[in-house]
Amino acid sequence: MGISVRFVIILQFLACACAHRQPTELREIFHFDTSGWAHDIALDGDSLYVADRQGGFLAFNIASGYKAPRIAAPVRDVISLSPNSGRPVLASRFEGLVLVSPSGEITGRYSNGDIANAVEVRGDLAFAAYGLQGLVIVRIADGHARLVSGLPTTGWSHDLRLSHGQALVADWNGLKVVDIRDPEKPVQAGFLPSPATCISLSVQESGGSRMVALAEGHAGIALVRLNAEGHPSLISRNYLGLKPSDPIHPGSGGWVHSVAWAGHYLFAANWKRGLAVLDCAEVENPRVILELPSSGTALGVKTRRQPDGSYLVFLADGESGLRIFRFNG
């Protein structure tokens, strides 16, 4: 077979493969205009929780098609929450960590005068990103909250994820990795500085390897690899056309505030610019493949894989409320 004939066959094969490849699509399937500013999303089984700042928090049943949410506003300015198997622990701007019963009643609080920005629960321990107080660990039992320990940070602790025996903290100044195997004596295990503002993070594990995506405000997104000891190493970055030197909380434009993995895709809640989708199949070169404008302020994003291989994307869109999309990558 001649070279030219083989070349034609290869082109025909590639054309056929492209013709049968499902195009990338991001389609909105649900919108709910909350009474406050939708700030963060949490998923727990068939329950979808929205931290709605001035509107308290909302709980939707996913199986019912998100109809008739339970709206609870016992706390002022809910920034984030941990579902905690139907007993939510709220991170409140003014009231600290707040324990809520399944019926919506407040059963306990922990406050130290700073702002609780994010919380995750493991067993009877709540781990909080607590502003200038850094990482705060609280024991929750019988509806009460008691301080166990803390680890101050040099920046403003804004978000965290628990991964194995470590807490990964977005500390504005950078990513802090904390060994929490002894909750009474948390110890810093690693740190990676940010060129702008490290606001939020998302962790993806595969084959024993951990890849962390960082939302870094005007520095866009960063991809970071963690080794077993928790030492972070920067793999790549995409600035999304932003400038690290620009001021925080801009009145317009982008400022990456949250990220969420969806397979090898990464979703970035990019402030007034809406939702960005990046293809990270080549982790050394993440590239933007879609941008969806927002009528609000894109603040928090979570994803969930569906049986057909698509993803549901849940966006806390500030003054525009909750938006849900289906993504086919």
Model-derived segments and their meaning:
Residues 1-3:
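N-terminal secretory signal peptides that target proteins for export/translocation
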Residues 6-15:
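Bacterial N-terminal signal peptides
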